[in-house]
Amino acid sequence: MSKKIQPSKKIHSLEDARKLAKKRLPKMFFDFVDGAAGDEKLCELNSTALDQIRLEPKVLRNVEKRSLSKKFFGINYNLPFGFAPMGMCDLTWPGADKMLANESLINNIPACVSMASTTSLEKMYELTEGRSWLQLYIFQDEKFVMELIDRAKKTGYKTLVLTVDVPIQFRRAKDDKNGFTVPFKIGPKQFFDFATHPNWSISTLFNGIPKPMNYETSKNGNKFVRSESRGSTDWETLKRIRNAWDGKLVVKGVMSQQDALKIKDEGADAIQVSNHGGRQLESATSAINALPLIRETLGKEFPLIFDSGVRSGGDIVRALAFGADYVMIGRPLMYAIGADGARGLRKIIEIIIGELSTTLGLVGLTDINEITSDIVAQKYFKDMKY
């Protein structure tokens, strides 16, 4: 049963949430949420590229009543966006995973559970009443992955998201500087960081140090090592996962038209166009620039999910106009939870929904499913029609 949460009175924009989270969280954990690969320019580019897409206002349409409902994988969701997989969420505030599950239930949208979630996949499925998807990485030892697939089947999961864009983890300067590792290593620098953020520290000590619970509950005693190699993953790996999983399979982290076509041919049910929020190859293009090219390659009917750089309801509309069928958001949720817990999360979701509905009406539409590239000013989107 969902729990009704009152929205935060401290937050009026995403930037408010980010600033409050920066004050409230230990630097080590705020930087983990806020940071990206290398010089972090790709993370900025993701958002800038979305913002540069200009929409064309339409007037004298009756847009008093508007619908945001979206069907994906045959399921009717109340909104065209869900929650991206995010590992170790409870570092932003105790119970963060459960807050996300509650909002998934309230809004009837999918919450993708990270392999490194601080709440077990079984518990998240229970809390979302079946709205969870499960995200996996592939490691050199696939036994644990197959164990999680088996657990997901037994629990009732219908959708598996396979992340393929981290064969090697790119350097993140802020994490290196702060000494952020999993498992945690606490030295004088980290101790001082925690001591100067007493609210977070006391709450975390009271609730227990967050752990990657899918590992903690493994029957084989697997331990999470953030730097563990995934470099051996190849097309044969994808085939094995496809053969092992009879539900819907989403392949996440695709930016190449050539890769997208092959992944489709290998039997994936959907592709998630993503550059990992700018946290992997720093010299990659923005994810929104790759989206229409992949849509053009795969045709109109193949399901595409989009993430990376989404910061507003307007960004969701832009992504849908550029060819996405569904959108996932991540970092804004962590800012909101870091800023004011469940109340912050409730408020930022309300803001995004409001922006989404307003943008839909201002481009002259009443149904989210009516969005096509026609709403994009042609200067920005010539000769592409989706």
What label would you give each PLM region?
Residues 2-74, 183-233, 369-371, 377-386:
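An N-cap/entry alpha-helix motif that binds or orients negatively charged groups
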Residues 36, 114, 135, 252-253, ...:
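Active-site-adjacent beta-strand anchor residues
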Residues 82-88, 131-137, 219-224:
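Short, basic, glycine/proline-bearing loop/turn elements
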Residues 102, 140-306, 314-335:
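Alpha/beta enzyme core
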Residues 77-116, 121:
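Glycine-rich active-site/cofactor-binding loop and its immediate structural neighborhood
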